[in-house]
């Protein structure tokens, strides 16, 4: 009888302990359009995986084939004529997946989900992307299954401003639509932007016309992560180093390299569709992040 009681107590304590551990380990899904967009959250993701020991997965909607125009410097590296459109579109999807996974290894990404939708060309027109270019039912069905199975607490997307790539807008819109249609517990979905401490203008975003799920009433981000926080020996290290490492892995995308040392803050915006109940969870997560430093 005594052994049975002890076993029961031990079992209950194990359940409690696991619950406490899981409560402190955030589960995050990133949903982006291209195999380099994750750089917009690089410092935040690194802190979640390395300092809070959380899990971050990544879903990428397109195959990245349209990046051939920026691949000149990568041609001798890969020994492929990547700036030739036909050649670039043939080889870049595989190359960019490998680059992304190398970058993700730095950030601590756990699982990758590639949707392989066409990366046709740069456009601001999200309507054409959603109506013509991508297989939207397939994307939403797979996103739904990934979110349901992953039991995520948060989803990170890029803030879908008017001036951003139509593919970026599309990826965020589909994530918002998928979350809104969930019958089970919904993760909090956030839109991210970057800014510099010397910026003379600030982001103003309240939503995209014809896409009410993108509505944001707040006039400023709910929270930000400072890439310039210093740590290590004589405080000589910052999270910008991690961001630069991550960017450097995307060698086929020459224009990406120009973002090194740019962007001081990763800003996260709260979509109205989350309701107010998720705000406290967001603030708790980022309070932990802003009080944690890698050691």
Report each predicted region and the residues it spans.
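Metal-dependent de-N-acetylase/amidase catalytic core
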Residues: 2-3, 20-31, 128-132, 136-295
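Sec-dependent N-terminal signal peptides
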Residues: 4-14
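Sec/Tat signal peptide C-region and signal peptidase I cleavage site
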Residues: 15-19
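Active-site rim/loop-helix segments in enzyme catalytic domains that contact anionic ligands
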Residues: 20-150, 177
């Amino acid at each position: 009888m005594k052994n049975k009681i002890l076993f029961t107590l031990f079992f209950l304590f194990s359940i409690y302990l696991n619950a406490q551990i899981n409560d402190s380990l955030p589960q995050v899904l990133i949903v982006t359009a291209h195999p380099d967009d994750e750089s917009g959250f690089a410092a935040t993701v690194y802190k979640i995986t390395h300092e809070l020991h959380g899990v971050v997965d990544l879903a990428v909607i397109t195959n990245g084939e349209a990046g051939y125009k920026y691949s000149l410097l990568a041609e001798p590296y890969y020994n492929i004529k990547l700036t030739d459109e036909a050649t670039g579109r043939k080889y870049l999807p595989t190359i960019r997946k490998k680059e992304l996974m190398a970058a993700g290894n730095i950030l601590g990404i756990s699982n990758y989900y590639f949707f392989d939708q066409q990366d046709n060309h740069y456009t601001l027109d999200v309507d054409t992307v959603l109506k013509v270019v991508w297989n939207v039912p397939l994307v939403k069905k797979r996103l739904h299954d990934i979110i349901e199975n992953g039991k995520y607490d948060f989803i990170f997307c890029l803030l879908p401003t008017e001036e951003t790539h139509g593919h970026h807008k599309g990826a965020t819109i589909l994530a918002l639509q998928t979350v809104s249609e969930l019958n089970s517990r919904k993760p909090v979905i956030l839109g991210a932007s970057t800014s510099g401490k010397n910026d003379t203008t600030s982001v103003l975003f309240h939503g995209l016309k014809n896409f009410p799920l993108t509505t944001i009433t707040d006039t400023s981000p709910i929270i930000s992560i400072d890439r310039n926080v210093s740590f290590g020996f004589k405080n000589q290290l910052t999270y910008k180093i991690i961001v630069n490492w991550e960017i450097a892995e995307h060698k086929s995308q020459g224009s990406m390299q120009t973002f090194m040392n740019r962007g001081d803050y990763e800003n996260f915006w709260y979509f109205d569709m989350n309701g107010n109940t998720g705000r406290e969870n967001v603030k708790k997560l980022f309070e932990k992040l802003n009080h944690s430093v890698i050691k």
